A protein has these predicted regions:
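Generic recognition of long tandem-repeat/solenoid scaffolds
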Residues: 93-99
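Catalytic grooves of carbohydrate-active enzymes
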Residues: 103-145, 346, 414-418, 423-441
Length: 450
């Protein structure tokens, strides 16, 4: 957890199979610029160092690998009106020598690095050869030992919160344009070059808002570049990861299911997400979402504004949007046959109880969820602090006998609700592509609420 560790195999694999990011360093060429600038002295030739915050600081994660293949993609200068000039050839060693014309200009240094992100020993979700390592180290050993049980005892494989893994661990608000590194690979570079043309390197700085000229032309161009980048990226994720894993499973007589992180808009962002909910899960045999830790609550569409960990809680999305993501993918993708899965009940604490679990089940059933993965049974001694409630808890859960009644009820209702085609009278546009172009785009939960 999260999916992508591949049994630790990436610790010993070639650098080319590991995760990679791109970054930008921007520097205004003001009145004190005299025609030369030492890029090394200004620390513009490497990614800006950041201290871990939030969950990364709490977990005190240490880099699993350190890489020495950092490189510069290109160096450009941007004029406030939108004009860009490639000055890569004007750099002598680490010194820029360029006569600045009149006007306001910003230096942009774009580079790529593998020394970014919290999980540097995980597969690169955009590289098919890297994703194949997950098959070789986890899936194929299962086939080797238990092939006779595939399709019988072993129903399939579950991907749990696979991530692109750039930026900070579980970062919030990481819309396109914010100060973060972005996922990269040779595959993405080739596709982006083909889509944007020979001047693609000069367009890369538009992926970030920092010091972006306040010009309508520039903003339109930036929206185009960001949309193309995310389109290329998420199609690579779909093909390299989701379709490849799902294809292997079906070839071996089992299903492929799971979910990504959907919280706080992550379903259409990088970082802890896969950039696009539908593309990220397109190779699966069921759609999937996760309700955990007080996300869905009775009358919880407005309050509370924070979860149990003190992080922001978007109750409007959890109440109106979460289950609809899974239902939509299950209905519009023939391969899923209407099957929408939800991992449910986990980490609500011991106060959850059967009454709240019944509410959660009903909430999800009427919104199109047909398959459930209850979270979680724990073999650890009671009380295990890891994400309770635990349904048996070695006999310490007094409501466990009634949990069986709830499961029987959910099975009966889900059998009925999944027995025919859903007829939708209203269509809501998935806002992923709109947010890539404009971070102020209305999220889908707003019209769903109305």
């Amino acid at each position: 957890f999260p999916t992508g560790y591949a049994n630790g195999a990436l610790k010993e694999k070639p650098d080319s199979l590991c995760r990679q990011s791109i970054y930008v360093r921007k520097y205004p060429l003001g009145k004190d610029y005299g025609g030369t600038l030492n890029l090394a002295e200004k620390k513009l030739l490497s990614m800006k160092e950041k201290k871990p915050t939030g969950m990364a600081a709490f977990l005190n994660l240490q880099p699993a690998r350190t890489f020495d293949d950092d490189s510069i993609i290109g160096i450009t200068v941007q004029e406030c009106g939108g004009k860009s000039v490639d000055v890569t050839d004007c750099v002598d060693g680490t010194v820029l020598r360029w006569e600045k014309p009149a006007g306001e200009w910003t230096l942009c240094v774009c580079g790529k690095t593998r020394n970014a992100g919290p999980h540097r020993d995980y597969i690169n979700m955009t590289n098919p050869e890297s994703c194949k390592i997950l098959l070789e180290t986890v899936y194929e050993p299962h086939w080797k030992h238990y092939s006779e049980e595939f399709g019988k005892t072993i129903a399939g494989f579950f991907s749990d919160e696979p991530e692109l893994g750039n930026a900070e661990l579980y970062i919030k608000g990481n819309v396109m344009g914010c100060d973060q590194d972005l996922p990269w690979s040779d595959c993405v570079e080739a596709d982006l070059s083909a889509r944007l043309g020979k001047e693609w390197k000069m367009m890369l700085p538009m992926l970030w808002d920092e010091l972006l000229p306040d010009s309508l032309t520039v903003r339109k161009n930036a929206a185009m570049v960001r949309t193309v980048y995310m389109d290329v990226l998420t199609k690579r994720v779909r093909n390299a990861f989701s379709e490849q894993i799902g294809g292997w499973c079906r070839e071996h007589g089992v299903q492929y299911i799971g979910h990504m992180i959907e919280d706080e808009g992550q379903h259409c962002r990088t970082g802890s997400g896969l950039g696009h909910y539908f593309r990220g899960l397109q190779g699966q045999d069921m759609s999937g979402v996760d309700d955990i830790g007080g996300q869905i609550l009775p009358q919880g569409e407005e309050e509370p504004k924070q979860n149990s960990l003190g992080s922001p809680r978007n109750g409007e999305f959890y109440h109106y949007g979460l289950a609809k993501l899974a239902e939509s993918a299950a209905q519009i993708e023939p391969q899923k046959h209407g099957n929408a899965m939800c991992e449910v009940f986990g980490n609500y604490g011991w106060a959850e109880g059967i009454r709240l679990e019944k509410y959660l089940a009903d909430h999800l059933l009427v919104r199109g969820i047909t398959q459930f993965v209850p979270h979680a049974f724990s073999a650890a001694p009671f009380p295990d602090p890891d994400c309770p409630p635990h349904f048996y808890a070695h006999g310490h859960n007094p409501q466990y006998r009634w949990f069986a009644k709830l499961m029987a009820y959910m099975n009966r209702v889900a059998t009925i609700t999944s027995s025919d085609l859903h007829v939708a009278h209203v269509a809501i546009l998935y806002h992923g592509e709109q947010e890539w172009a404009d971070c102020s785009a209305m999220p889908m939960e707003k019209p769903l609420h109305k």
